[in-house]
Structure formats: C-alpha cells, structure tokens
Curated annotation (Swiss-Prot):
This is Selenoprotein M. Its main location: cytoplasm. It comes from Homo sapiens (Human). The keyword Signal applies. GO terms for biological process: adipose tissue development; corticosterone secretion; hormone metabolic process; multicellular organism growth; response to selenium ion.
Length: 145
C-alpha cells in the first residue's frame, strides 16, 4: 500500500489547509483608497442569517452603539458587511464580516480610527467629531490635542 498521493490530491489538500488562514479576517486598510473616510455602516439582515453568526451578532447588537459615526442598517437577506463611507456618503469599500470574530471586527474598526466611546451616550472628543477615521500615523501626530 502506497502513502503517496497524486499531485492533484496533494494540491487540494494544501489548498484546504491554507484557505482558513487566508480568510476575510486578514483585511488590511489601503489608506490611499480610504482617503476621506469619515463614517461607516454595517449592513446586515436582522433575522435568521445574523442569528447563525453569533460573533457578528454580538458586535452588531452590543458594540456598534459605542462607536462614533458607525451605524447599522437592516437589509433583508444581506450578508453582514462593513461599508466604509466618505464625507459625502460615497462608498469607499465593503468588507465582509461573516468570517470574522467579534474581537477581529472591533480591532478592525479601531484600526480604521473610529472612536469607541465609554458609553453609548458619552461625549465625543473634538478631534473625532467630523472625521473619526484616520491613518494610524495621523492619529499619533495629534495625540496631544
């Protein structure tokens, strides 16, 4: 009995092992494309599909109210996506959320520069009122404001 696999089977096995590691959770912002990012919305269905995605549902129901300029929009049958918007509400990019954990989504939103308030009704610092999302190098330059 031979343990050697044909090349096609080896390729399929390798692809199956690598695919989970390269899922949508590896999103990296392209700051050139996201120039002018000021707000975002999470588009998702409100029912059965969201109920299957416990991590995404927890983010939508519990975390979104804490973020400034991040809202939720119910769309029947929609897969959960983070829609990044510019100053005039023009769509800059869509990021699928289905494969991400609650922790990964929160990390992404914070990496994009959205301000997380201490409480849903808390005041927002002046530097985050009009343009909550900035590249990391810009936020570090203005940390003293």
């Amino acid at each position: 009995m031979s343990l050697l696999l044909p090349p096609l089977a080896l390729l399929l096995l390798l692809a199956a092992l690598v695919a989970p590691a390269t899922a949508a959770t590896a999103y990296r912002p392209d700051w050139n494309r996201l120039s002018g990012l000021t707000r975002a919305r999470v588009e998702t269905c409100g029912g059965u599909q969201l109920n299957r995605l416990k991590e995404v549902k927890a983010f939508v129901t519990q975390d979104i109210p804490f973020y400034h300029n991040l809202v939720m929009k119910h769309l029947p049958g929609a897969d959960p996506e983070l829609v990044l918007l510019g100053r005039r509400y023009e769509e800059l990019e869509r990021i699928p959320l289905s494969e991400m954990t609650r922790e990964e989504i929160n990390a992404l939103v914070q990496e994009l520069g959205f301000y997380r308030k201490a409480a849903p009704d808390a005041q927002v610092p002046p530097e985050y009122v009009w343009a909550p999302a900035k590249p990391p190098e810009e936020t570090s330059d203005h940390a003293d404001l």
